[in-house]
Design a protein with these regions (language model features):
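Hydrophobic ligand-binding cavity/cleft-lining segments
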Residues: 10-90, 208-209
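Short beta-edge strand/loop motif at the mouth of beta-sheet-based domains
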Residues: 70-106, 114-117, 201-207
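A short, structured loop/turn motif at beta-sheet edges
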Residues: 57-61, 88-89, 113-119, 137-146
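Beta-strand/loop substructures that line and gate deep hydrophobic ligand-binding cavities in soluble
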Residues: 123-178, 184-186
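Hydrophobic pocket/interface hotspot
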Residues: 62-67, 73, 95, 111, ...
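Beta-strand elements of well-folded, non-transmembrane domains
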Residues: 56, 99-103, 113-115, 128, ...
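Short, surface-exposed coil-to-beta transition loops
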Residues: 51, 104-109, 130-135
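Short, highly charged C-terminal tails/helix-capping segments
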Residues: 35-39, 181-209
Length: 209
């Protein structure tokens, strides 16, 4: 009788576990798509992002302009479909970011604050985790730029959050940041080189006149 009484229990547990797992997977899917915010504020773990440091062979003001252009100026063609401005008040912007991932695009909504020429800060409003704060710091070094990225990411639900936030979201997030910063570096250095060539031609023209 005991065996008969316990017989259905493993199946019930498996079914319940599968239901919970499916619910968690669905919640994470909708959060990654920016369709819901998983902000329970229970059992939260904080994971550092970065630091990531780059030396960019371009003046600080030019690097800042490259970072700010999609938010405060004309949207570059390379950013079309990746960034959508939802609201703007001076140097504070609310933007939707769409990032291509192997399975499906991830969508986040963030506030972005610009403090020219040394700092840009990002605060997550909606996305795959309840808490992300990031900072770009730009320091001038003899006409070049020391670019440093730092931040933190928070996920809820104790051990589940530590695994999800620290082992799943963080590596993907930092890879996206590294790829983005590589694009900033390339664009800034290309513009700096073009500016240098214009100055050189102007100097040569003045010398011939």
């Amino acid at each position: 009788m005991r065996l008969l009484a316990l017989g259905p229990l493993p199946g019930m547990l498996i079914g319940a576990s599968a239901t919970v797992a499916a619910g968690v997977a669905a919640a994470f899917f909708f959060a990654s798509r920016g369709l819901m915010a998983l902000d329970l504020d229970v059992g939260r773990s904080i994971h550092p992002l970065g630091p990531i440091t780059l030396r960019i062979r371009a003046p600080r003001d030019l690097v800042f302009d490259v970072v700010a252009a999609p938010y405060l100026g004309k949207m570059p063609g390379s950013m079309e479909g990746k960034i959508e401005i939802l609201d703007r008040h001076g140097d504070l912007v609310v933007a939707l970011h769409r990032t291509a991932l192997p399975v499906r695009d991830a969508i986040t909504v963030e506030s972005v604050a610009f403090e020219r020429p040394e700092r840009v800060t990002f605060t997550l409003l909606r996305g795959p985790v309840p808490h992300v704060r990031e900072e770009f710091r730009l320091e001038d070094h003899e006409g070049e730029t020391e670019f440093t990225y730092t931040g933190e990411l928070g996920a809820d639900l104790w051990a589940l959050g530590r695994i999800y936030g620290g082992r799943i979201v963080k590596p993907v997030w930092e890879k996206v940041v590294r790829d983005s910063l590589a694009q900033v570096k390339a664009a800034a250095e290309e513009r700096a080189a073009a500016r240098g060539r214009r100055v050189e031609r102007s100097t040569e023209d003045e010398g011939r006149s």
